[in-house]
Regions:
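Catalytic machinery of carbohydrate-active enzymes
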Residues: 1-166
Length: 166
């Protein structure tokens, strides 16, 4: 086995530790029949409340249906509650994890929190597409027009009470 034969694009590749097919079945890249090349990398930023993190986990199965060969990285303050068998990389919200995600590239990055640190993190992440809430001109901003309504209803109680959208 040579380094040039390592399949770095495989969903099972962990980098610093042996992959699951190697651990369980002694597979090595150059002869592995379980190679699962990553086509899409998604970062989910959901730092906040425990209940909110739990309520957003159905996104994982939805994205898996939309994007075959998906690799999900999720950064949160509650890493222990996320389904480890459905998310490739679960990171605690700390300096090391922020450093890691801001030095990688993603196809899609989604920030579901309106907290400043989450918004600034999305702004700093390298992603082809960004959704949710970001940071621009020293304040929270919508990453796409679809997030604008949610921001407005969050800014003003009276508009939120009149809200007919979800």
């Amino acid at each position: 086995m040579e380094l040039k034969e390592v399949k770095f694009d495989c969903r099972f590749f962990k980098g610093e530790i042996p992959c699951l097919p190697n651990k369980l079945r002694n597979k090595v890249c150059n002869t592995c029949d379980e190679h699962d090349p990553i086509k899409t990398r998604i970062l989910i930023i959901k730092l906040g409340a425990l209940g909110d993190v739990i309520r957003t986990t159905p996104l994982v199965s939805r994205y898996r249906k939309i994007y075959p060969n998906l690799h999900i990285t999720w950064i949160t303050q509650s890493p222990d509650i996320l389904p480890k068998d459905h998310i490739e990389k679960i990171l605690p919200f700390d300096f090391k994890s922020v450093f890691l995600v801001t030095h990688q590239s993603f196809d899609i990055a989604i920030n579901l929190d309106k907290d400043q640190e989450a918004c600034q993190l999305l702004a700093d992440v390298d992603a082809k597409q960004k959704f949710g809430f970001t940071w621009k001109d020293q304040h929270i901003a919508a990453a796409t027009p679809a997030a604008e309504h949610k921001l407005i209803t969050g800014f003003f109680d009276n508009i939120s009470k009149e809200n007919k959208k979800n």
